[in-house]
């Protein structure tokens, strides 16, 4: 029997290149991957941060596809990880008597961030086409002296074509664990399921097709006043009601939710918040990446 589904994997190991001839140490990486993953050319910013776009060459996912994505940051690494295109999840295949509604496509993500390392994982949006079934899981282990920034942008259906999610489902589970010398401490857990029911519910998405999350977990000893100032600055820039934003302060970081009708508006909001996070951390100002949509004017 010929297999028709993808089973791809990608392993990325980042480490600080102390032998760099320049004044700033650069983060470099080693990788191992199979189709449909493809790594595009990496670059570096002025702080030696490795900027790596990842491409999914298959053009999308269907039921039964399984992707394994593993990222490891060695000590003193700085990484910006993104994707070169939106992830598309098509209507499920594999419908049978056993699975009358079809089969989920799945992606499992394992991330380990060692001491004094900083990962920004900013993939482009995931589009759930009509009847698409998708499940993603993230398990993140982070040291007490490291940070993790993650954005997750979901569009249910192609509203420009009058398409909704129909019987499709999006599931996501994010677990962030803080490592220390004595024990592992749960830092953040988030579990989401989006479907037609949540899309139409007045207390849910209320027919807003775009849902986004931004999670920033900072170093354990990061100043609480700086976190409060960060949230204050974000609220000064955005009217939370008008921009469909909800901002919360975590024990060590912030959580932001976006709900609206425009992926472009969500990207603009998250880019602005990213700039504010970079500023409060004392890092260089981020630049709009060349693999991202060109029509987005980032004028905040």
Swiss-Prot record:
The family this protein is said to belong to: Belongs to the UreD family.
Record's subunit section: UreD, UreF and UreG form a complex that acts as a GTP-hydrolysis-dependent molecular chaperone, activating the urease apoprotein by helping to assemble the nickel containing metallocenter of UreC. The UreE protein probably delivers the nickel.
Compartment(s): Cytoplasm
InterPro entries from the UniProt entry: UreD
Chaperone listed as a keyword: yes
UniProt-recorded name of the protein: Urease accessory protein UreD
Function (record text): Required for maturation of urease via the functional incorporation of the urease nickel metallocenter.
PANTHER family documented for this protein: UREASE ACCESSORY PROTEIN D
Keywords: Chaperone, Cytoplasm, Nickel insertion
UniProt keyword annotation of Cytoplasm present: yes
């Amino acid at each position: 029997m010929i297999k028709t589904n993808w089973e791809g994997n990608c392993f990325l190991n980042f480490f600080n290149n102390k032998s760099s001839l320049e004044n700033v140490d650069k983060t470099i990486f080693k990788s191992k991957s199979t189709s449909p993953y493809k790594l595009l050319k990496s670059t570096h910013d002025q702080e030696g941060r490795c900027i790596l776009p990842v491409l999914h060459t298959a053009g999308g996912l269907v039921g039964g596809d399984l992707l394994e994505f593993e990222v490891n940051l060695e000590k003193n690494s700085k990484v910006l990880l993104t994707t070169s295109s939106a992830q598309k999840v098509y209507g499920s295949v594999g419908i049978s008597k056993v699975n009358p509604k079809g089969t989920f496509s799945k992606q499992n993500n394992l991330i380990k961030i060692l001491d004094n390392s900083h990962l920004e994982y900013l993939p482009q949006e995931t589009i759930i086409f009509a009847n698409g079934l998708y499940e993603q899981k993230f398990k993140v282990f982070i040291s007490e002296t490291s940070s993790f920034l993650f954005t997750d942008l979901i569009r249910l259906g192609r509203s420009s074509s009058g398409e909704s999610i129909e019987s499709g489902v999006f599931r996501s589970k994010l677990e962030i664990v803080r490592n220390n010398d004595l024990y592992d401490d749960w830092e953040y857990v988030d579990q989401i399921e989006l479907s037609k029911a949540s899309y139409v519910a007045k207390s849910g998405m209320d027919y807003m097709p775009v849902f986004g999350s931004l999670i920033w977990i900072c170093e354990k000893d990061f100043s609480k006043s700086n976190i409060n100032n960060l949230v204050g600055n974000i609220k000064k820039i955005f009217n939370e009601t008008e921009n469909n934003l909800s901002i919360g302060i975590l024990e060590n970081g912030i959580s932001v939710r976006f709900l609206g009708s425009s992926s472009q508006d969500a990207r603009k909001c998250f880019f602005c918040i990213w700039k504010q996070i970079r500023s409060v951390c004392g890092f260089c100002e981020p630049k709009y990446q060349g693999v991202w949509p060109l029509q987005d004017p980032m004028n905040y």
